[in-house]
Amino acid sequence: MINKIMKKYETIYALATAPYNSAIHVIRLSGPDAFEIINKICDKQITKEGYRIQNARIVDNDQIIDDVLLMKFVAPKSFTGEDSIEINCHGGLFVINKIMALLNKHGAHLARRGEFSKRSYINKKIDLNQATAIHDLIFAKNNLSHSASIKALSGEFSKDIKNIQQEIFRLIGLVEIAIDYPEYEDEKKELTEEFKNLTNIRQKLQRIVNKSLKLKQISEGIKIAIVGEPNAGKSSLLNALLNEQKAIVTNIPGTTRDTVEGQIVLNDELIINLIDTAGIRKSSDQIEQIGINKSFKTIDKSDLVIYLIDLNKYQNYDKTNIYKYLINKKKQFVLVGNKVDEVDPTLNTGEIQIKISAKNNDISDLIKYLEETSLAIFNDENKQDSIFQEEWQINLLQTALYNINLILNDPNQYHDLVIQHLNEANNSLLKVLSEYEDYNLIDEIFKNFCLGK
C-alpha cells in the first residue's frame, strides 16, 4: 500500500543535483524532523521561518564541514507538503558525502527514487499526471515533449480528462435510472439522446490517444531506413547525415552486411534514427543474403524509407525488387538520386524526387524534406487536445476508449452490459486522474524517478 504510505513519518534526504564535482550541490531534506536534524549539524539556531534563506556552517563536533545556504520551507507550503530544507553546499563529492553522512547519523533516511514527488502526491500537492510531468520535463528531448510536460504540470490535461470522466459518470446515473425504472419512456428518450454525446467523447479520446502515441513515437525517434542496391552510396549518405565516419565506405559491392545505425536531431526537436542497410540485390552469397533479408525487415519497421539510387545506373535500376516491395507494403518512401555530380545535368530522371551528392555532402534538399515529412507525422490539428507521454497513461486511456467502442458498436445491448462498460471506462479515467488508487501502479510510476526528485 504505497510502500505502507512510505513510512509516512520518516525524514528523508537525497542529493538533488548530479553526483559530480561542480560549483554547487543541493541536498534535499524533508519530513517532520527536518528542522530538528538540521539544528544538530549547524553552528547556529536554524529558525522555522518559511521562504527564508539562512547562512550557516555545517559542523561535525568542532570540525567545520562547509559554509552553506539553507532554503527553508514550512509545512504545508513546500513541494512535499512537509517541513523541508534545501542545503546549498559547495560541489565537492567529499563535502556532500560528509553532509549526508551527518544527516543519516542524526536520524534522516536516504530517500528512495521519486520519494519526494511521491510524498507531494500523497499530501495532495500534485496529482499523478503532474508527478509524471515532472519526470517527463526532466527527460524532454524536444519542444513538443517539453510543451506537453509544461501543460501537464499546470494541471491543464487533468482538467480535460476530468470533464470526460464526469460526462461518463453522468451517463452511468442515467443508465441506472433506466434499469431501475424501465416503465418511464421519457428516461429512455433522454438516454438515447445522451448516447449521442458518447460519440463526441469517443472522438475526443481517440484524438488524445492518437496524438499521445505520435508524440511518444517522435520522442523515441522516427525510424528512417536507407535502402538501395549495392554501391548506391547508402553508407556515404549515413555518414554525411551524421557528419561522422560511422559506416564503412568502399567501392566493393556488398560491403555493408548488417544494419548500421545513428541518430540526428533536426530543428532541436525531431529525433531521427537512421538505419543504413545492406545493399539489396540477387545474391548467391549466403552471408550477404542474411544481410539482405535483414534489410527487408528493417523496411517493415521503419516510419519512412529513403530509397537511394545511383544516378549513373538510373536508366537500368530494378523496379521489380525494392520498389515493388515498398509499394506492396504501403511504406512511405522517397526516391533519392545520388552522385548527381557524376551525371549529365540534362539526364532525364523523372521519378527521382531529390538529387544529392552524399560524397560531397550536398544533401541540404534531403534534410529539408526529412524535416517537413517528420513534422507531418505529428499532425498539429486540434492543438488544444491533451497529450500524455507515459505508457501507463496511454494504456488507461485506450482501455476507456475500448469500452466506449463496445457500447457504440452495439447500441441495442442490455443496459446491464452498458453499465459494465461505462464503469470500466470511468475507472480507467479515475486512475489517470489518481482518484481511483492503484497502489501497485503508483509504486511503479515513482520507482522510475530520479533520486532527489
Curated annotation (Swiss-Prot):
<keyword id="KW-0963">Cytoplasm</keyword>
<dbReference type="GO" id="GO:0005829">
    <property type="term" value="C:cytosol"/>
</dbReference>
<feature type="binding site">
    <location>
        <position position="231"/>
    </location>
    <ligand>
        <name>K(+)</name>
    </ligand>
</feature>
<keyword id="KW-0460">Magnesium</keyword>
<dbReference type="GO" id="GO:0046872">
    <property type="term" value="F:metal ion binding"/>
</dbReference>
<dbReference type="InterPro" id="IPR027368">
    <property type="entry name" value="MnmE_dom2"/>
</dbReference>
<feature type="binding site">
    <location>
        <position position="235"/>
    </location>
    <ligand>
        <name>Mg(2+)</name>
    </ligand>
</feature>
<dbReference type="Pfam" id="PF01926">
    <property type="entry name" value="MMR_HSR1"/>
</dbReference>
<feature type="binding site">
    <location>
        <position position="86"/>
    </location>
    <ligand>
        <name>(6S)-5-formyl-5,6,7,8-tetrahydrofolate</name>
    </ligand>
</feature>
<dbReference type="GO" id="GO:0002098">
    <property type="term" value="P:tRNA wobble uridine modification"/>
</dbReference>
<comment type="similarity">
    <text>Belongs to the TRAFAC class TrmE-Era-EngA-EngB-Septin-like GTPase superfamily. TrmE GTPase family.</text>
</comment>
<feature type="binding site">
    <location>
        <position position="256"/>
    </location>
    <ligand>
        <name>Mg(2+)</name>
    </ligand>
</feature>
<feature type="binding site">
    <location>
        <position position="28"/>
    </location>
    <ligand>
        <name>(6S)-5-formyl-5,6,7,8-tetrahydrofolate</name>
    </ligand>
</feature>
<dbReference type="InterPro" id="IPR031168">
    <property type="entry name" value="G_TrmE"/>
</dbReference>
<feature type="binding site">
    <location>
        <begin position="276"/>
        <end position="279"/>
    </location>
    <ligand>
        <name>GTP</name>
    </ligand>
</feature>
<dbReference type="InterPro" id="IPR025867">
    <property type="entry name" value="MnmE_helical"/>
</dbReference>
<dbReference type="Pfam" id="PF10396">
    <property type="entry name" value="TrmE_N"/>
</dbReference>
<feature type="binding site">
    <location>
        <position position="255"/>
    </location>
    <ligand>
        <name>K(+)</name>
    </ligand>
</feature>
<keyword id="KW-0630">Potassium</keyword>
<comment type="subunit">
    <text>Homodimer. Heterotetramer of two MnmE and two MnmG subunits.</text>
</comment>
<dbReference type="Pfam" id="PF12631">
    <property type="entry name" value="MnmE_helical"/>
</dbReference>
<feature type="binding site">
    <location>
        <begin position="231"/>
        <end position="236"/>
    </location>
    <ligand>
        <name>GTP</name>
    </ligand>
</feature>
<feature type="binding site">
    <location>
        <position position="125"/>
    </location>
    <ligand>
        <name>(6S)-5-formyl-5,6,7,8-tetrahydrofolate</name>
    </ligand>
</feature>
<dbReference type="GO" id="GO:0003924">
    <property type="term" value="F:GTPase activity"/>
</dbReference>
<keyword id="KW-0547">Nucleotide-binding</keyword>
<dbReference type="InterPro" id="IPR018948">
    <property type="entry name" value="GTP-bd_TrmE_N"/>
</dbReference>
<feature type="binding site">
    <location>
        <position position="453"/>
    </location>
    <ligand>
        <name>(6S)-5-formyl-5,6,7,8-tetrahydrofolate</name>
    </ligand>
</feature>
<feature type="domain" description="TrmE-type G">
    <location>
        <begin position="221"/>
        <end position="375"/>
    </location>
</feature>
<keyword id="KW-0479">Metal-binding</keyword>
<keyword id="KW-0819">tRNA processing</keyword>
<dbReference type="InterPro" id="IPR027417">
    <property type="entry name" value="P-loop_NTPase"/>
</dbReference>
<comment type="function">
    <text>Exhibits a very high intrinsic GTPase hydrolysis rate. Involved in the addition of a carboxymethylaminomethyl (cmnm) group at the wobble position (U34) of certain tRNAs, forming tRNA-cmnm(5)s(2)U34.</text>
</comment>
<dbReference type="GO" id="GO:0030488">
    <property type="term" value="P:tRNA methylation"/>
</dbReference>
<feature type="binding site">
    <location>
        <position position="250"/>
    </location>
    <ligand>
        <name>K(+)</name>
    </ligand>
</feature>
<keyword id="KW-0378">Hydrolase</keyword>
<dbReference type="InterPro" id="IPR027266">
    <property type="entry name" value="TrmE/GcvT_dom1"/>
</dbReference>
<keyword id="KW-0342">GTP-binding</keyword>
<feature type="binding site">
    <location>
        <begin position="250"/>
        <end position="256"/>
    </location>
    <ligand>
        <name>GTP</name>
    </ligand>
</feature>
<dbReference type="GO" id="GO:0005525">
    <property type="term" value="F:GTP binding"/>
</dbReference>
<protein>
    <recommendedName>
        <fullName>tRNA modification GTPase MnmE</fullName>
        <ecNumber>3.6.-.-</ecNumber>
    </recommendedName>
</protein>
<feature type="binding site">
    <location>
        <position position="252"/>
    </location>
    <ligand>
        <name>K(+)</name>
    </ligand>
</feature>
<dbReference type="InterPro" id="IPR005225">
    <property type="entry name" value="Small_GTP-bd"/>
</dbReference>
